[in-house]
Amino acid sequence: MVIFPKNIDGYKKLIKISTFASRRGFYYYPRIDYKTLKSFWNDKDLKLAIPFYDSYVFNNTLYSNLCVPELDFTEPVYFLEDNDLPFDELVTKKVNNLSKNTQKTQSIYYKNKKDFKAYLTYKCINNRSSLDKPELDHMTSNEFCVESWKEKNNG
């Protein structure tokens, strides 16, 4: 999930959420439970977004996970992406069944297509794997860059 501040009060709430997650919810990385998040929440100041690839919808669809987040305190916006990957259509259908509150987005991880190998090397180092066998699901496209986004949007 991604939390966006809508104004200065939202920014202040986001700092409180982040501080709580870092100090009281830390377990290898900052985290917060839904009950606590709900206690900080105000739709006037904050907006919740559900990413396309790194989300419960994606994991439930592709890996048969059974995550059901408690989102009764807000109406999140769901990000949609189309990167010509085989599962994009499956996840898009699931998202559209969940909500009409969607926004087309594009994940960007590096600047140019030629930078993909450097990005993959970085991911392999973090994953403790090698370029010969990266063991990174769906890391098959060099289209997650500014260059590809410009091509799609500027003709």
Language model feature labels by segment:
Residues 1-155:
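Phosphodiester-processing cores and adjacent nucleic acid-binding clamps
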